[in-house]
Amino acid sequence: MAGKEKAVWPPVWAAGAMSGTSFDGVDVALLLTDGVRIEAFGDAREVAYSDADRAILREAMGAWPGEARAEVAAQVVEAAHITAMVDLPDVALLGFHGQTLAHDPEARRTHQVGDGAVLANALGVEVIWDFRSADMGLGGQGAPLAPFYHWACARWIGAQGPVAILNLGGVGNITWVDPSIEGPELPGACLAFDTGPANAPIDDLMVRRGLGACDVGGALAARGEIDLKILEEALEAPWFDLAPPKSLDRDAFSGLADAVSGLSDADASATLTAVSAGAVARGLAHLSSRPRQVLVAGGGRKNATLMAMVQDALGCDVRAVEDVGLNGDALEAQAFAYLAVRVARGLPTSAPSTTGVAAPVGGGRRSKPGARELS
């Protein structure tokens, strides 16, 4: 593929693990990288949470350290990650994000459960974790965390001009990438921010009404009518006018549940899906130049109704990342493998244009099996 620059360091195999705010399960992926370029993709897998575990995680949302519900959630997260990775091939490093329960960038607080030292001892591999704290300590939002990897992906696919990678998870986030810039931390290489609610309000609606874990394929929304008044009011929220970089807690738009409470199941799903698509359009309005393509990762790309609404709202080429040879189910897990190698090699993992941090900074604590934390 294009973008195969000469390696600065010998590439190593690393694993990355991600448990997102859609509560689907643990995504694990292997990546061969030198921390700058992508050399090769390895195996990827997802281990789904049980209904009981998913309920525990939902109950723990919004919890801060010290709360009993957070401790129970941590046990679920650690056990699921160990199960997902116990039989992986040997790797040099594991990048572990943990499960976000609460995120308040204005107060410089964030909470991901899951102890990297527990995983290091259980799996016998060095674990790099807690990627957000250093960034937030220097004034950053602590999120989004995948933009530097998105830059590497844009170069790997040989993008010839600006491209945007949109992740539609519980919260949506987008990275605008100029692949001609020689490093992701350099000015002009990346602009990244959360776009707003994505799958979370739709998923919560389905669970609340006993309709399942998600609107599979957007089939329910496709049968509904959009309530334009609710849509317009939702997209008038002041948050959408804030200049990036910016990040959002999963439940920041939880008031949407009350807004659609009087609608039928189909109309409620259609309206929330339109809000998610409209949030992406509001986000792209902050970009200084339009990307040639918007490549979509995350569970939302499997929602045909949401994808069609995003296409209509943006009016540019919108397609799933699989169309350019990437794995949308593994992308975020791969990102943490990539970031782990960057941390191990002293490279930045965020920059002013991705999180608002004062200067490029490398985040992440390091835990080796049977040893004290390294940093």
UniProtKB/Swiss-Prot annotation:
Keyword check for Transferase: yes
EC supergroup of this enzyme: transferase
Region described as Disordered: 351-375
Pfam family, one: AnmK
Keyword DNA-binding: no
Pathway it works in: Amino-sugar metabolism; 1,6-anhydro-N-acetylmuramate degradation; Cell wall biogenesis; peptidoglycan recycling
UniProt record, GO biological process: 1,6-anhydro-N-acetyl-beta-muramic acid catabolic process; amino sugar metabolic process; peptidoglycan turnover
Reactions listed under catalytic activity: 1,6-anhydro-N-acetyl-beta-muramate + ATP + H2O = N-acetyl-D-muramate 6-phosphate + ADP + H(+)
GO molecular function, one term: phosphotransferase activity, alcohol group as acceptor
Matches recorded under InterPro entries: Anhydro_N_Ac-Mur_kinase, ATPase_NBD
Binding site for ATP: 20-27
Entry's EC annotation: 2.7.1.170
Keyword annotations: ATP-binding, Carbohydrate metabolism, Kinase, Nucleotide-binding, Transferase
Function: Catalyzes the specific phosphorylation of 1,6-anhydro-N-acetylmuramic acid (anhMurNAc) with the simultaneous cleavage of the 1,6-anhydro ring, generating MurNAc-6-P. Is required for the utilization of anhMurNAc either imported from the medium or derived from its own cell wall murein, and thus plays a role in cell wall recycling.
Family recorded in the similarity comment: Belongs to the anhydro-N-acetylmuramic acid kinase family.
NCBIfam families for the chain: PRK09585.1-5
The protein, known as: Anhydro-N-acetylmuramic acid kinase 1
Gene source species: Jannaschia sp. (strain CCS1)
Organism lineage: Bacteria, Pseudomonadati, Pseudomonadota, Alphaproteobacteria, Rhodobacterales
